[in-house]
Amino acid sequence: MDMKKIGFGLALCAVATVCAASSFANAAENKAEPLPKNSGFETPGANGNGAAEWNLYGNGMWRVKRGEGRNGTTALICDDVGKGGWTTQWVNVEPGRTYRVEGWVRTEGVEGGGVCIDFSWHDAYGSRAGTAATQPRVMGTTAWTKVSLEAFVPPAATKRCLIGTPVTGNTKGKAWFDDLRIVPLEQPPIGQFISNAYRNRAADGPVTFHVALGATKEEVAAKGLHGRFVVPSFAGVARNIAAEPDGADPSDVSATVDAASLPPGESKVVFELIDGKGKKVASKSLAFTRTAKPETKGVRIDRRGITHIDGKPFFPLGMFMWRATPEVIDHFSKGPFNCCMPYAAPTKAEMDYANSKGLKVIYDIHACYAGLKWATDRGITNEASEVAYVTQRVKEFRDHPALLAWYINDELGLDWIKRLAAHRDLCEQLDPNHPTWVAHYMVEDIRGHLPGFDVIGSDPYPICQTGDPPISQVMEHTRITRKGVFGARAMWQIPQAFDWGGYRVQDKDKTRPPTFDEMRNMAWQFIAEGANGLISYSYSSWEKMKWRTPVEEMWSRACRVGEEVKSKIPIFLSEEAAPKVTPITKDASVRAWRKDGKIWLLAVNPTYKPKVVEFAIEGFGLNRSVSLEPLGVWFGEIRE
């Protein structure tokens, strides 16, 4: 994950309070008080300064002025967007609902990152948990321009949300803002519809179809909602498979069929939502392809989430880095790792050298969305130039033996989903033999991002993070990630291997890097919660804080953790069906595998106190338990 997500700068921020939501609520204008208050900045603040309900910050660059608004009214003005600052207000919204955030922007001589309106929310620890921004950003000198975004505020969000206008520190120019609004939208009755088959293609074997309902459990009960999958068959007769929503959690309705029973080639599986009177409320279809034989060429993901390279199982174990130069690769290849993710897109010579050292490369094409500064630096100014850039890179490296995957998103929010999905689709079209991978810290949004990736990587970094979340945030976020993808997508998770002080310079005296025990514990938390790969952040970040912790020490910690994980990879990749294991103890992670007939169990204590971890194993008569030290990890064979 790119630390660029922290550096927004100028922000006009409003904080929102959230309560419960109705998924089928009318999206017409909310009869409640319009949001935000004083949206046109017409009412002056105390002593005639600023605007009532708003707090203005930022080096004296923010002011309000009558006659500068859209119709000669009042506008909020930032005289120098490059000097940053923000304006904030508290507002009230409901979690579990989608909102349209809109406003009007005028600019003069804006260069660099551009100007937009931003909306974000926080988690229970006070950290930003999700964000969205209007796209494309407003650049140059413009007349009043309406901008808008749509954002889903997850049910788990706290009562703090931000509405703002972030720009990067590299932006310059002047900007005006007027008439901001936050409007609730209607929740569609049927949400994401996917299968657990890689790219919805399979020749045989069980395939599970998953659908998310846009209804609360109360609405499911009150309206008698239920569903059915209409599945085509080899014989030409469609089958209706009843699917009842879980009364406790209707967010996943599923059905499993044998892929061999589907007609050859592409066909459509349909999900129909039915109410208690038998009336069809809504329907949605999914294109699925039954192939003539299993596809094994290149890099693919099986239905357990395990990666395969030309048919052989593979567990990605690597790190982010800045550039994969020969000097860096010489050093990195001496560790236990089998892949790397360099932000500076490698040259052919660098790819060749990585391959000669036995390393796979996740190729970075994430910074090519028009409107981002990094895209502008590459000469990308519109969506056509995005496509040209991605096409050129993919065609150049799609057949390279070092290529593992395409990295296409580094923390961009749901407001980018159409373009993220378009890039994923383009990568598949140009290169059907390698998956796309993304990094995403806004875990509550991941289900909405499903069209935009093949493999997900979420990246909780709890050690000395703002809000001081517990180290068990790794466990919590990975569980949310797994649920967000219906357990049907591979997770190459991203452990913290850096000191936050390298990115929050103002807090550097309050931060530290994770210890070896913490790095080890976080890695095993990820795996215990279902990770199919680990790509730590970041090999190159240690230089920033080497005055506190030597680079050699951080490298040693990363290698010790990596060696331990590497030693268990043959077990992770076993094709034998593993027994289901369920933690009984709160705040603990467990997972089981079966290899050569033996059952292997992983138990993790994600706390700084000793803990007895109790768990139940499918097929075992009695619950079992292991005693773990603070941050303890146990991995061993368990017998009936």
Question: What annotation goes with each model-predicted range?
Answer:
Residues 1-14, 23:
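Bacterial N-terminal signal peptides that target proteins for export
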Residues 90-91, 259, 617:
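Hydrophobic core positions of the immunoglobulin-like beta-sandwich fold
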Residues 200-217, 271-276, 280-640:
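Glycan-processing catalytic domains of CAZymes
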